[in-house]
Amino acid sequence: MGSGLPLVLLLTLLGSSHGTGPGMTLQLKLKESFLTNSSYESSFLELLEKLCLLLHLPSGTSVTLHHARSQHHVVCNT
């Protein structure tokens, strides 16, 4: 089994455009192969967009992926 690459996915759920709603943090570990199997930038942005749909996050939800090398951000548009 390959070593895992620690990634922290922070999901900030906003109840309104003023940011007064509830918050949630989800931590995930993705395998090293995730980085080597596809284009780095587009893979993370695509992952964040799919999480919006999979978790049924409301439109306007801010989703940020923090990684040692970079940070990726998407606002859900469902």
From Swiss-Prot:
PTM per Swiss-Prot/TrEMBL: N-glycosylated.
GO CC terms in record: extracellular region; Golgi apparatus; transport vesicle
Tissue: Predominantly expressed in lung, where it is detected in type II pneumocytes in the alveolus, and in nonciliated epithelium in bronchioli (at protein level). Also detected at lower levels in cervix, esophagus, stomach, testis and kidney.
Principal localisation: secreted
Gene, per the UniProt record: SFTA2
Glycan attachment sites: 37
The protein's name in its UniProt record: Surfactant-associated protein 2
Top-level taxonomic group: Eukaryota
Role of this protein: Putative surfactant protein.
Signal peptide: 1-19
Species whose genome carries this gene: Homo sapiens (Human)
Compartment(s) of residence: Secreted; Cytoplasmic vesicle, Secretory vesicle; Golgi apparatus
